[in-house]
Amino acid sequence: MESEKILMAAGVTVAAVVGAFVFWGPSGSRLRQRRGQIAGLHNFGLTCFLNTLLQAMAACPQFIAWLQLYNNASPDRKSLITSMLNTLEVVNGTHATLRGDPYSPGAVLRALNALGWVIPQEEHDAHELFHVLLTCLEEEAIRPQPLGCLSDALPTDNDDNSSLAGTATPVGGFRSFSSMAAGLGASQRIGDQPNRPSSAMLTDFLNMEYDESTSLQRLVRSEAHTPDSPASVCERDGNDRLGSVLLDAVSPGTPFGFPLVSNPDSLATPMLGGERSSRPRLPQSQQQQDEGLNRRVSSSCRSLERLHRGPGRVSIWSNMMPSQVAHPFQGAMGAQIVCNGCGSKSAVRYDKFDSITLNLPPQRRTGLSLGHLLSEYITSEDLSDVKCDSCNETTTHTKSVTFAKLPACLCIHVARTVWLPTGQVCKRKDYVHFPESLSMAPYSFVQPHLNSQAGTPWGSTMSLYSSSLPMNNGVGGGEGFGTMFPKNLYRLLAVVVHSGEANSGHFVTYRRGSLRNAHRWYYTSDTIVREVSIDEVLSVPAYLLFYDRGQQRQLNLR
């Protein structure tokens, strides 16, 4: 009797626990609530300059979309593009599988090290690292993908190297040049050459030097051309026509399945893309024997062409480079010189930029705004004693500079480090008012009455003056210009603040949330994340400002 009561009580307890778990336990809704929450980042010791920049760039949806574009085109888990994308998605709480609060950005540091950047364990500038990251990301995005040798298109026989012409090898059975060289004996290599690794492995560190624009140390690499590198695929030694060799008869004793040709000049070089030009006619029996091989080689070349084409890839079978998508921080400044005597205008010179650096006025003053600094940035400059090519007179010329192409994401750097007459460096802590909505129309080349966009890659170049638009020098963000020029209206995404002195301190980031929390603002300092008000954000002494022109704007093609 007692045992039955105990058993019944145990059953009721288990049922109550199960019911509580079903009604109040973890559910999909709670997982969805965790999605989109901002995560902190581990500090490895003086790496706040990296954490603050990752938090700021994680608040830029268009930059993340650009990373996704190239990561989908050529995924490589050890590349900087993939490492950055994974880190930013984990920070935003949007990664499909990874979670972490705080999360370790060690993969980004390892990717930078693999690209040749050595970051000593000391304090660094976040603005310098910003340019380092963009430079490395752009190099990864536009560099040609490592392709195999033309011999990869040859059918192979796993048993021996004889009678390749009569073996029906599948088109998809490609082998790389390096793997073929490693599997053959020394007597089977062309000219008894030693085994050579692939070009991706032959990277020699020649010397160590410092880039003039940054204090971060970079190792300069030298890539050697090997037989499987794109630079040496189409031309080996003088008149050696490797492509025509592929289309000739294969002798049983030939290393790598290549025939030994005594007179390469007698052979015709095939056209890229799987086509070949006319060549001397072979004997009828040999022509029939090689007819099947030629068809397989041609189809293999076309298959390789399809495999190696795509966004961010360069195919050795095509003489046209695919269009590359520039990162969203890339813009262009336009400079033009006007003769004050005859009024002739020079051709517009365009210079690309990833960020703009605004200098503080020599004397500290109150009421300083971002509009004042932008106005000073594009102020015209008088050049004296310049000879005009039009009137041949030596007169004063006026040089004007404006934003010719506005980027999708705008990074503004407020330079706060100055040198004193004594030779010491100090940091200025002036407060610069910056708006949540910024219109760049007063500082750009804007001529609404012109419908023609011809003349330059950035539009018409009749003049670089922004018509008669007033400068946005007030404390407002120029909301009135936003209705006139909506494409030039930017919204604030993140603010990087440096606390401390010129030689030491700490970086923190104020940033927008992700997904449904994009209207909220968060304070991030390494592993610390807390929600703040927009008033607190607009009251901090900004060092780096991140703006964008809207989440749905299409990426610009170069």
Curated annotation (Swiss-Prot):
It catalyses: Thiol-dependent hydrolysis of ester, thioester, amide, peptide and isopeptide bonds formed by the C-terminal Gly of ubiquitin (a 76-residue protein attached to proteins as an intracellular targeting signal). Keywords: Hydrolase, Membrane, Mitochondrion, Mitochondrion outer membrane, Protease, Thiol protease, Transmembrane, Transmembrane helix, Ubl conjugation pathway. The active site is at C48 (nucleophile), H506 (proton acceptor). It is found in: Mitochondrion outer membrane. Residues 39-550 form the USP domain. Residues 280-289 have a biased composition (Low complexity). Belongs to the peptidase C19 family. PANTHER family: UBIQUITIN CARBOXYL-TERMINAL HYDROLASE (PTHR24006), UBIQUITIN CARBOXYL-TERMINAL HYDROLASE 30 (PTHR24006:SF888). This is Ubiquitin carboxyl-terminal hydrolase 30 homolog.
